[in-house]
């Protein structure tokens, strides 16, 4: 429980941090985020407070994933689901390596959706994934193919397109960041 990552980003003059989601204290905010039309379009997970609490509780007890809340200056703005790619549904769609990490994400607070903020949190969460498990060499995302706002930010943060493929519920684009490339070419 608690905070797992914190660093100051001088480009935006903000403190970025990630903490484990709490199904009690984060429930109302998480429910509001999941019921936001823009978030619901990509996540397809709108529902009542009870539905969202149950979802967060499942994530907290999962053996292959865990939920994080992203904060700027200690104000929550986003939700990240960190998972082991080999144990997730994405593992059937590429040649995974042991310790590959995956990421699902949403930005729930509109004032933090600007391009300059995206580079901060996207590089920050990638940095966290690589620091959290030193054996992790690659991080993967599989956003919906029509999430153009996100795609334009991925390459500057070190992600490259691997392929497009279909899940039962969506057409996705797999993107991947490599540890060596991130630390030598991209950075924070």
Residue ranges and their predicted role:
Residues 145-163:
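Conserved active-site alpha-helix within GNAT-family acetyltransferase domains
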Residues 85-113, 117:
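Conserved acyl-donor/pantetheine-binding loop and adjacent beta-alpha core of acyl/acetyltransferases
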Residues 69, 75-85:
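Conserved beta-strand in the GNAT
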Residues 1-24, 185-186:
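Conserved N-terminal entry element of GNAT/NAT acetyltransferase domains
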Residues 86, 160-174:
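Conserved catalytic-core motifs of GNAT/GCN5-like acyltransferases
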Residues 131-143:
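Conserved GNAT acetyl-CoA-binding A-motif
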Residues 114-130, 152:
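Conserved acetyl-CoA-binding loop-helix of GNAT-fold acetyltransferases
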Residues 47-67:
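Active-site rim helix/loop that mediates acceptor-substrate recognition in acyltransferases
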